């Protein structure tokens, strides 16, 4: 659901890129990483992992209040803002800003998530001062000049029009509307042609001012920088922002279940999606639910759904289940694609496996294997580079899990019992799901 902004790599970042590529081989050093919290004199906090294996500093940060802060009738504005932050700031117009960024050999990107605006910078340690100055300007003093506004808006509109007849795009929007109704989560990420046309420069400035504030900020830094230097740099980058944000409150969204959605398209496959209740991140049964999901459909090539649908019957090339969590909603989603004439059979088989999980739970052997996967896979998926570490540490802070979470997570997973999994499976999977079928033949897919 996250749309990434353009990643600018200019004329001089070849050394940065080379170091980053080399850094992938150096990642095992991060396995025993020490995370420390630093706080500046102005109260700006960040989590820091010092790593001098390469002369690079990676900074990841987030401002709470993403696309859910789009004003009604001007959906897409937060995404547009992230596209424009490196298109001129302070006394630098778009061309001048990009030239300075190229000269610094830095990588800068911004992205709009549903609940936060994210930023990222990677730069050689020796060039960080000039790069951080540009980052400060981008987040504090974006210009929103008319020419880049018109250009970027036109590019987004062109993308919207190009995807207007794409069945996957139509199906995704139908799915989000069915699950979330009128909640902001159901909105199109980039807005629409009409809502983007309504956005003015004044609107861009107003929404930017509401979101970009020190009290709304989460930061993680990984690389060749010491705490004292980082404190100074954080104040330089973020110290000029207003103290507090002015966010529009967002209510929790309860996914709408028990619905049947049919989207007719002339496709070679029928796409099946099922939504069951999810579980909040802070729920005591969260890790039991994750282990249950791993066994049901989260483990590639090893899950029950994979075994029954793919291995035994060859009904699909792939099938998955996932626990989706955003700040104000959660759901367990199952998805696969199959031949249209086998869609009803596939759907029936999926629901039978879900019922079996709900009624019988899992075995000790299944649970042991799932624990090994969740514990062992975490470092591979989330701590495999300095950028991944920074991203993970920002997310942990946004979820308010505490600085010891990376280690504590192992203990929480190990503590889950077969009885815990059985209880959460019954809780989540006894519900009547929402089912969406996309394809040329929709006969026989009623639940």
UniProtKB/Swiss-Prot annotation:
PROSITE patterns: PROKAR_LIPOPROTEIN (PS51257). SUPFAM superfamilies: LuxS/MPP-like metallohydrolase. Gene3D superfamilies: Metalloenzyme, LuxS/M16 peptidase-like. GO terms for molecular function: metal ion binding. Keywords: Plasmid. It holds the Pfam family Peptidase_M16_C. InterPro entries: Metalloenz_LuxS/M16 (IPR011249), MPP/UQCRC_Complex (IPR050361), Peptidase_M16_C (IPR007863). Belongs to the peptidase M16 family. This is Uncharacterized zinc protease-like protein y4wB.
